[in-house]
């Protein structure tokens, strides 16, 4: 059995022990020796003495197997090294040892680990193994958007196109987010189903009326389908809500250009360029506030996963 599959199997055992109600392993939270060792580990880590920090974290876990910060420290080292099997194993232990209030965030980290294991399997051209890891990621955190996207991609790569589409459609019913809808739009476009493309974004806009990125995506679909009147109406409505959006003015300029209204097109393009021309709806990291031109699975600045959300595309 490969290490990644062994890790996948062990999650059930780890979660079963947690659910069974067994007492948590000793954490050393009030032990003077544990506190002093943790202080030294932190100092070593901050000073760049990584091997010393690892040794101290391992000592803590030998004496106090439920020491949460030692588990986090070794997990972070594993992530930095790209050792996702080790990271997942440590995260399973951390999920067991963590207090109830911390379990949601620890579940998110477990999802990250399985997601990265799945990506490794895809890179090895083994989509079936990747599917198992992505499903494990979603069992850990059902709201983990990168896992939903990647699960569908892996199913497609494995030849199960129908299940891939069902995976994305089920997720879109409750979480109509732009990257997810883009996957479905691609499918419907390939199948020459423009009505489904329009219905997809209309339903999403009705479900989340405050998400301006969805409204812009509906306008873009109208534009690409040559429904210029509908596209113009959609972007003019958006202009009222976000008058300084370069996305809105870029599309209005393109609409006027298609209509042959050269002067109006020039005016809109000029506004778009002044504001920062872009046809893609920008995103912002919920953790550190960094903006990105499009959605990404991981923030380029703080390196957190699943934190980018649509933002108002203004200066």
Model-predicted regions and their roles:
Residues 25-28, 97-108:
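Flexible helix-coil transition and linker loops at the boundaries of alpha-helical arrays
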Residues 65, 99, 142, 175-176, ...:
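Short coil turns that delineate tetratricopeptide repeat
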Residues 33, 67, 110, 144, ...:
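Residue-level recognition of tetratricopeptide repeat
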């Amino acid at each position: 059995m490969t290490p990644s599959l062994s890790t996948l199997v062990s999650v059930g055992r780890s979660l079963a022990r947690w659910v069974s109600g067994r007492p948590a392993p000793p954490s050393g939270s009030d032990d003077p020796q544990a506190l002093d060792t943790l202080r030294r580990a932190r100092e070593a880590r901050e000073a760049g003495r990584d091997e010393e920090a690892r040794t101290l974290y391992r000592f803590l876990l030998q004496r106090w197997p439920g020491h949460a910060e030692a588990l986090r420290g070794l997990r972070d080292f594993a992530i930095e090294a790209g050792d996702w099997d080790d990271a997942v194993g440590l995260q399973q232990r951390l999920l067991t040892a963590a207090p109830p209030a911390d379990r949601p965030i620890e579940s998110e980290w477990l999802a990250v680990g399985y997601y990265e294991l799945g990506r490794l399997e895809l890179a090895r051209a083994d989509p079936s193994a990747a599917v198992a890891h992505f499903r494990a990621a979603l069992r850990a955190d059902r709201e983990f958007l990168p896992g939903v996207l990647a699960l569908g991609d892996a199913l497609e790569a494995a030849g199960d196109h129908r299940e891939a589409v069902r995976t994305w459609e089920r997720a879109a019913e409750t979480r109509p987010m732009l990257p997810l809808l883009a996957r479905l739009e691609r499918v419907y476009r390939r199948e020459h189903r423009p009505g489904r493309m329009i219905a997809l974004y209309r339903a999403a806009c009705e479900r989340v009326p405050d998400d301006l990125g969805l409204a812009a995506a509906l306008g873009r679909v109208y534009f690409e389908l040559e429904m210029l009147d509908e596209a113009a109406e959609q972007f003019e409505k958006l202009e009222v809500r976000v008058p300084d959006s370069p996305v809105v003015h870029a599309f209005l300029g393109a609409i006027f250009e298609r209509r042959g209204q050269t002067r109006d097109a020039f005016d809109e393009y000029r506004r778009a360029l002044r504001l920062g021309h872009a046809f893609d709806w920008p995103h912002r990291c919920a953790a550190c506030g960094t903006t990105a031109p499009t959605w990404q699975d991981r923030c380029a600045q703080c390196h957190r996963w699943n934190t980018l959300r649509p933002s108002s595309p203004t200066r």
